[in-house]
UniProtKB/Swiss-Prot annotation:
Purpose: Component of the type III secretion system (T3SS), also called injectisome, which is used to inject bacterial effector proteins into eukaryotic host cells. Acts as a regulator of the HrcN/SctN ATPase activity.
A Pfam entry, by short name: T3SS_SCTL
InterPro entries listed in its UniProt record: T3SS_SctL/SctL2, T3SS_Stator/FliH, T3SS_stator_protein
Keywords from the named record: Cytoplasm, Nodulation, Plasmid, Protein transport, Transport
Name assigned to this protein: Type 3 secretion system stator protein
One GO term of the biological process aspect: protein secretion by the type III secretion system
Family according to the record: Belongs to the SctL stator family.
A GO cellular component entry from the record: cytosol
Record text on subunit structure and interactions: The core secretion machinery of the T3SS is composed of approximately 20 different proteins, including cytoplasmic components, a base, an export apparatus and a needle. This subunit is part of the cytosolic complex.
Subcellular location: Cytoplasm
Source organism (scientific name): Sinorhizobium fredii (strain NBRC 101917 / NGR234)
Length: 208
């Protein structure tokens, strides 16, 4: 059977998939679209503002934290400097006495006569080598011992002649050496006095 091509085609029956929008409501739909676009633009502006506000607050918080940290660090440094200064002052005050006590303990283990001989011999060899004569003023109890120790100092071979004189005002640790150049106190007591004076001078000068 062949189709009848002489007849005009009949248009299909089209039905809407949903309800039709009346022409009177088209304005409402356009307004709704504009409102939606405006809402999206506002949302974008809010996000931009919020991001900028976050960055500002973050920077402010960092700056405040940095300033606070700097202030705290300055306070810590100031306290540390004060503590060091206080400890230094205490040390400067106690160090001389501590040194004296340590030396006294160490030297206390030696015989006073031996220390006196060493001090005198050191002075003669270092400062009076070449002098004609030196006279040692010592405690009477030390005369014989020093006479034996320096019996070889007879004025020959550039060694001064050593003469011993008793002096009851001196302790067994003391000795005053007289020479053509003047006199000088020797012995442990004199050295400890010189050490104390040296500490006192350094303390007064602020160098200790």
């Amino acid at each position: 059977m062949t189709a009848d091509i002489s007849a005009a085609p009949v248009a299909p029956q089209m039905r809407p998939l949903g309800p039709l929008i009346p022409a009177s409501e088209l304005n409402i739909w356009h307004s709704a679209g504009d409102a939606l676009a405006a809402a999206k633009r506002h949302q974008q502006r809010v996000r931009t503002w919020a991001r900028a506000a976050y960055q500002r607050e973050r920077a402010r918080g960092y700056a405040e934290g940095l300033n606070t940290g700097a202030e705290e660090m300055s306070g810590l440094i100031a306290r540390a400097v004060t503590e060091v200064a206080q400890r230094k002052a205490v040390l400067e005050k106690e160090l001389p006495q501590l040194v004296i006590e340590i030396l006294s303990d160490l030297l206390g283990a030696f015989d006073p006569g031996e220390l006196l001989v060493r001090a005198v011999r050191h002075a003669i060899e270092r400062r009076y080598n070449g002098a004609e004569e030196v006279c040692l003023h010592v405690c009477p109890t030390q005369v014989d011992m020093l006479a034996r120790e320096f019996a070889g100092c007879d004025g020959r071979e550039k060694r001064p002649k050593v003469r011993i004189e008793p002096d009851p005002t001196l302790s067994p640790q003391e000795c005053v050496l007289w020479s053509e150049y003047g006199n000088v106190a020797l012995g442990l007591d004199a050295q400890m006095r010189a050490l104390r004076l040296g500490f006192e001078y350094l303390s007064e000068e602020g160098e200790l």
